[in-house]
Curated annotation (Swiss-Prot):
The gene is CARHSP1. One of its GO terms (cellular component) is cytosol. Residues 1-12 have a biased composition (Pro residues). One of its GO terms (molecular function) is mRNA 3'-UTR binding. It comes from Homo sapiens (Human). This is Calcium-regulated heat-stable protein 1.
Length: 147
């Protein structure tokens, strides 16, 4: 019996030895209304926003817009500003009130810059002011109503 420890395991030196061959892989994707818009990464949320950014946003003006799309399972969507301009990113943590936004809902919101470059904006303190007519709305607790 030898008192020397066994040599440490060596990592594989060739891709084929670990099953990573250069083969084209395609992934089926479901159509998404959010595909044309770029989602910030990492997603800025109410929890991760700094106190100073929250204060600046709260003191800012209130804007009006329409919900372009919102995916509850993904936790984000976009608002089309009433005065034109590029769509504004919306995170689930910034939606106030009892209803999940749907396409066509009229909303009011304030804006906050998205770090680290602060070049883009996101909607915060989002409030649904008018539910889109003829659509079903869900509450955060799961109840469905027709508007």
């Amino acid at each position: 019996m030898s008192s020397e420890p066994p040599p440490p395991p060596q990592p594989p030196t060739h891709q084929a030895s670990v099953g990573l061959l250069d083969t084209p892989r395609s992934r089926e994707r479901s159509p998404s209304p959010l595909r044309g818009n770029v989602v910030p990464s990492p997603l800025p949320t109410r929890r991760t926003r700094t106190f100073s950014a929250t204060v600046r946003a709260s003191q800012g003006p209130v804007y009006k817009g329409v919900c372009k799309c919102f995916c509850r399972s993904k936790g984000h969507g976009f608002i089309t500003p009433a005065d034109g301009g590029p769509d504004i990113f919306l995170h689930i943590s910034d939606v106030e009130g009892e209803y999940v936004p749907v396409e066509g809902d009229e909303v009011t919101y304030k804006m906050c810059s998205i770090p680290p470059k602060n070049e883009k904006l996101q909607a915060v303190e989002v409030v649904i002011t008018h539910l889109a007519p003829g659509t079903k709305h869900e509450t955060w607790s799961g109840h469905v109503i027709s508007s």
